[in-house]
UniProtKB/Swiss-Prot annotation:
Name of this chain's protein: Lysozyme C-1
SUPFAM superfamilies xrefs: Lysozyme-like
Gene3D superfamilies assigned to the protein according to its UniProt record, in alphabetical order: 1.10.530.10
Family the entry assigns: Belongs to the glycosyl hydrolase 22 family.
Enzyme Commission (EC) number: 3.2.1.17
Effect of E32K: In isozyme 3A and isozyme 4A/4B
Effect of S55G: In isozyme 3A
Organism: Ovis aries (Sheep)
GO molecular function: lysozyme activity
Tissue expression per record: Expressed in stomach.
């Protein structure tokens, strides 16, 4: 019985943690999903962005008390403008997606929403990109990844 409880807790912690991608694994996945060069944004810039937004974690969340919104998933997509979490006041849902879908281990829906955002607002929509990636050499993010 004790072993079952421990096993259950371990499974729960894995479900809450989600998938944390390895850098090169994420690079390959983003490339397969068409982000390399999308709207002129290099794969290295996408990796830099996701490193600083979520540390490559699909289940990352960040609550923003000022706007009463939450950022979700590997790209930290905001519930005020881009996804529906059912609790953010006056949400727009620009990507027409549930915020929980942006935290799935399969990041296809998150990538589709990121493409929509970068198409409308450019990569500067992400504060972490402006703070940590813009005007920096980001080539190290794809270095050694055999793409």
């Amino acid at each position: 019985m004790k072993a079952l409880i421990i096993l259950g807790l371990l499974c729960l912690s894995v479900a809450v943690q989600g998938k944390v991608f390895e850098r090169c694994e994420l690079a390959r996945t983003l490339k397969e999903l068409g982000l390399d060069g999308y709207k002129g944004v290099s794969l290295a810039n996408w990796l830099c962005l996701t490193k600083w937004e979520s540390s490559y974690n699909t289940k990352a969340t960040n609550y923003n008390p000022g706007s009463e919104s939450t950022d979700y998933g590997i790209f930290q997509i905001n519930s005020k403008w881009w996804c529906n979490d059912g609790k953010t006041p006056n949400a727009v849902d620009g990507c027409h997606v549930s915020c929980s879908e942006l935290m799935e281990n399969n990041i296809a829906k998150a990538v589709a929403c990121a493409k929509h955002i970068v198409s409308e607002q450019g990569i500067t929509a992400w504060v972490a990109w402006k703070s940590h990636c813009r005007d920096h050499d980001v080539s190290s993010y794809v270095e050694g990844c055999s793409l």
